[in-house]
Amino acid sequence: MTNTFFPENERRLLSIHAHPDDEASKGASTIAAYHDEGVYCALVCCTGGEEGDILNPAMDRPEIIDNLPQVRLAELQKSADIIGYDEVIMLGYRDSGMPDSPANSNPDAFANADPEEAIGRIVSIIRRIRPHVIISYPDER
C-alpha cells in the first residue's frame, strides 16, 4: 500500500494519548520541537476526558460541568494548535475514569472497548499516516 496523502520525503510523527490534556502534560515540548523542524505531527486522543477532575476553581461551575465533553474538546483543539499538531483524531470512546470507579461500568467506556476493534482503528490511522515515530505509553494494567 502506498501513501498518497503525504509527500514521500515528509517526516511524520504520531502521538497517542488517552485523554484531552495528556497532549499538553506529556511530551508537548517534544512535539513542538519536531513541528518546528517541519515534521508532520498527528495526535490520536482515545477518549473525551469526561471523567477528568476539574482542578481550576474558576472552571468548577455547572455550565462547565454539564458540558464537560465539549469543553475538553475545545481545550484539546486549542492546545493541539498551540503545541503544533497538524491533525487531531478522536477515537470517540468515553473516558473510563480511575480503576474501579463507577465510570468503568459504562458500556461506551474505553476500558470496555473491544480490543480488536480499538486496535484496528489505531492500525488504520497508522497505515494512513505512516509515521516514522509513534509516541505512546506502556500497558499500565
Q: For each predicted feature, which ranges?
A:
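Gly/Ser/Thr-rich loops at beta-strand to alpha-helix junctions
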Residues: 22, 140-141
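Short, well-ordered beta-to-alpha junction loops that form the rim of enzyme active sites
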Residues: 91-94, 136-140
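Active-site rim/loop-helix segments in enzyme catalytic domains that contact anionic ligands
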Residues: 1-129
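Short, Asp-centered acidic motifs that coordinate Mg2+ and/or phosphate
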Residues: 133
